[in-house]
Amino acid sequence: MSRRARALHAALALLCAAAVLSTAAQPDASYFTTVDVFVVSDTPVAAWQVELTERRGAMQIVGIERGDDSTFRDPPYYDRVAMMRSSTDRIVLASFSLSDAAQLQRGKVRVARVHVRMTGTPEPDYEARLVAAGTADGRPIDAQLSLETQTER
């Protein structure tokens, strides 16, 4: 084997070793967080729809829970197929209650908790939009949307 071939083999071996060591030394940049979704209204809320987006495209939704209000017994409706695609930077959630208006909550009500796996970005950039909110008799109401996150690193 010529001197040039040995030098080329040595350089290639060093390059491969450096590549293996650099990938082994990098920690997984993903982490889990939750996004609590609140609807805020002075009027009792019987139905709502929310669109949640992560602007950087680094969000993978891994689960969805119902909120604190017992009148919304089940988790909100959402597109399960989109969630199973494992890279969802946008999801639409919605729920309704058939309870009497007297049983419905008003004020700041947690209506859902979204479990998220974030990848490749230090801080998520969420955007949320309240698409609709309504009363027990189907009238639209003025309401605001609020998000709270908790990181589980």
Placement of each model-derived feature along the sequence:
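Bacterial N-terminal signal peptides that target proteins for export
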Residues: 2-12
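Bacterial N-terminal signal peptides
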Residues: 10-20
